[in-house]
Amino acid sequence: RAFRQKHMLRIGVNDIIRDRPLEEITRDISRVADVSLQVALEAAMKTMESRFGTPHAETGEPSRCVILGFGKLGGKELNYSSDIDLMFLYDAEGQTQGQRISVLTNDDFYARLVTEVVRLLSTHTDGGLAYRVDLRLRPEGNRGPLARSLASTLAYYDTLGRTWERQALIKVRPVAGDVKLGEEFLRAIEPFVYRRYLNVAEINEIKALKRRIEHRSGP
């Protein structure tokens, strides 16, 4: 929180006194969020590993995870009061190793990790809160797991992905964690996002989405 307040003050000075371009201001605000997310992820991972051990893939390799940013964060367009839209992704199914008392599947481990990251960022303290976190853009929204494996996430978009989810993925980017895993996801999801052909149902969904946007915008 102190880090965020310090740098938001610096950005505010650049914005108001030095009259820097809007693109530079929103980019700097987004960078502060990226660093804050990385620090929160590392702290949460340390806490979880001390309790449950280190998550591993079924191959025996240590598991990797990445936080993906959507919307204004993904597009490096955050303003001073923006929520941050996030999705948590890990590389493969498996379980924790290193603690005899309690072994967790990677599903359970990363769900707890997400909860801890959100707590660190959004709990009110004497210094306020760092960020309001929104996880609703993840597959299945509030009904879905807090974190998914790469394979499960790709399977969801391939079979159940909606038009609005395709649009949301246009601005997504890795913001913390294993950037290479995030880039692997971006490459794999590209055929879904930039589909060459649309079926009738998808075209109708686009038309319906356009009508909803126009209705909300008013006359």
Region locations from a protein language model:
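A nucleotide- and high-energy phosphate-metabolite-utilizing enzyme signature
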Residues: 1-219
